[in-house]
């Protein structure tokens, strides 16, 4: 990606959803696991994770990080993110958690309307949460990439 002529390697953010959000949190760590270390000519400046499995996150992010999660998410519970962020303390770049009341896992995806069960977990689109998350994601990226 960093070799592409249309990519400014100094203005790249990691954004992921669910399991991809775990990868996002992993690349955001100061001492990222070798598998997730970007090439030397690419440095992530910010990270945004939608409904990540926060319980699996290890180190505190070393870049500004924004986490979106639904209060009713039974796959990646919001409480796990709240607890993980509290355990990291306040030293370092900001880590912000946005919890959407009434929202489930997958709230960002319109194709999850109507909602459905997958692997014993409820997934459902929530237009209000998705619109707000989209707006806040753009604000976050503008703030940290420009």
What spans do the regions from the language model cover?
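Stable alpha-helical elements in mature extracytoplasmic
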Residues: 19, 80-84, 133, 137
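Hydrophobic anchor at the start of a short beta-strand
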Residues: 12, 65, 95
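Short beta-strand/loop motif that positions the catalytic acidic residue
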Residues: 67-69
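C-terminal catalytic histidine-bearing segment of alpha/beta-hydrolase fold enzymes
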Residues: 94-146
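Primarily recognizes the serine-hydrolase "nucleophile elbow" in alpha/beta-hydrolase
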Residues: 1-62
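Short alpha-helix in the alpha/beta-hydrolase fold that links the catalytic acid
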Residues: 63, 77-88
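Extracytoplasmic/secreted cell-surface and envelope-processing proteins
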Residues: 57-59, 75-78
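Acidic catalytic loop of the alpha/beta-hydrolase fold
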Residues: 72-77, 105
């Amino acid at each position: 990606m960093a070799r592409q002529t249309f990519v400014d390697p100094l203005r790249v953010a990691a954004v992921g959803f669910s399991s991809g959000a775990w990868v996002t949190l992993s690349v955001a760590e100061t001492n990222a696991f070798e598998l997730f270390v970007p090439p030397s000519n690419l440095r992530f400046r910010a990270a945004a994770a939608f409904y990540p499995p926060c319980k699996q996150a290890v180190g505190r992010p070393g870049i500004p990080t924004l986490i979106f999660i639904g209060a009713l998410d039974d796959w990646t519970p919001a409480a796990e993110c709240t607890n993980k962020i509290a355990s990291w303390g306040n030293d370092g770049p900001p880590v912000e958690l946005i919890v959407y009341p009434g929202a489930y896992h997958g709230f960002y995806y319109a194709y999850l309307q109507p909602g459905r069960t997958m692997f014993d977990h409820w997934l459902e689109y929530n237009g209000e949460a998705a619109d707000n998350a989209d707006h806040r994601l753009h604000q976050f990226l503008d703030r940290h990439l420009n």
